[in-house]
């Protein structure tokens, strides 16, 4: 299977986890395949909560109801991709810039199902640059603090998040303890959040491989 075929396969497999209630939906190319597959069974769910404006637009284009997170309770499941994921279910996310809303929706969900092709499975996080969402006026301060943590932050030029903030992509971080690093970066004044999903990692990984979809659970 090609990488895109793997993404389509895991997206279809993830639909089995959307049995009813309100579903949280992630952002990115793999999540887009999930939205397309979800459209075929939209009658069995009550609605969705989107993690970005782009996701909301795609859901609505399929006639799938998009709800405000503040108007609903706990979500049944959150389905999203990852830029990297380990066998311990810690992830780097945010390549598409939606990390803050993704992290919020994930925190409000009973179950997190990660869908990815096998190129995203890694032994140690950090080859993919870690996105950090930052209040614009704090950009330089946060960058200096990230250098102290061993990283090389670079501004994502010409990009503004749905929340009106900027993204620093941090290269060359040694992410041996993702839970501790997630906490440390979030404590820097001016950081909204970072793309480490370790404190709230995935519960299920649907991994697309050349031989089909493999399922891993905590």
From Swiss-Prot:
Catalytic activity entry: aldehydo-D-ribose 5-phosphate = D-ribulose 5-phosphate
Transmembrane segments: none
Keywords from the UniProt entry: Isomerase
Entry EC no(s): 5.3.1.6
GO function terms (MF aspect): ribose-5-phosphate isomerase activity
SUPFAM superfamilies: D-ribose-5-phosphate isomerase (RpiA), lid domain (SSF75445), NagB/RpiA/CoA transferase-like (SSF100950)
Record's GO cellular component terms: cytosol
Residue positions binding substrate: 27-30, 80-83, 93-96, 120
BP GO terms, sorted: D-ribose metabolic process; pentose-phosphate shunt, non-oxidative branch
Stored Pfam families: Rib_5-P_isom_A (PF06026)
Keyword Cytoplasm: no
Keyword Aminoacyl-tRNA synthetase: no
Active site: 102 (proton acceptor)
Pathway(s) where this gene product acts: Carbohydrate degradation; pentose phosphate pathway; D-ribose 5-phosphate from D-ribulose 5-phosphate (non-oxidative stage): step 1/1
Top enzyme category: isomerase
Domain of life of the native organism: Bacteria
UniProt xrefs under HAMAP family: Rib_5P_isom_A
Similarity section: Belongs to the ribose 5-phosphate isomerase family.
Record's function text: Catalyzes the reversible conversion of ribose-5-phosphate to ribulose 5-phosphate.
Subunit: Homodimer.
Record's protein name: Ribose-5-phosphate isomerase A
Gene this chain is encoded by: rpiA
């Amino acid at each position: 299977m090609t990488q895109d075929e793997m993404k389509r396969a895991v997206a279809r497999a993830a639909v089995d986890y959307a049995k009813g209630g309100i579903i949280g939906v992630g952002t990115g190319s793999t999540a887009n395949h999930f939205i397309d597959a979800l459209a075929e069974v939209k009658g069995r769910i009550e609605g969705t909560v989107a993690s970005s404006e782009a996701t909301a637009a795609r859901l609505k284009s399929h006639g799938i109801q998009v709800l405000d997170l503040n108007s609903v309770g706990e979500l049944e499941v959150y389905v999203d991709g990852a830029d990297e994921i380990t066998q311990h279910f810690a992830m780097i996310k945010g390549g598409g810039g939606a990390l803050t809303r993704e992290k919020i929706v994930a925190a409000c969900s009973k179950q997190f199902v990660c869908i990815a092709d096998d190129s995203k499975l890694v032994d140690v996080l950090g080859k993919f640059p870690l996105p950090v969402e930052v209040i614009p006026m704090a950009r330089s301060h946060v960058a200096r603090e990230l250098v102290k943590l061993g990283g090389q932050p670079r501004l994502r030029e010409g990009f503004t998040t749905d929340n009106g903030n900027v993204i620093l992509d941090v290269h060359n971080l040694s992410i041996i303890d993702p839970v501790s690093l997630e906490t440390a970066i979030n404590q820097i004044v001016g950081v909204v959040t970072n793309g480490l999903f370790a404190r709230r990692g995935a519960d299920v990984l649907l991994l697309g491989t050349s031989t089909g979809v493999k399922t891993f659970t905590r």
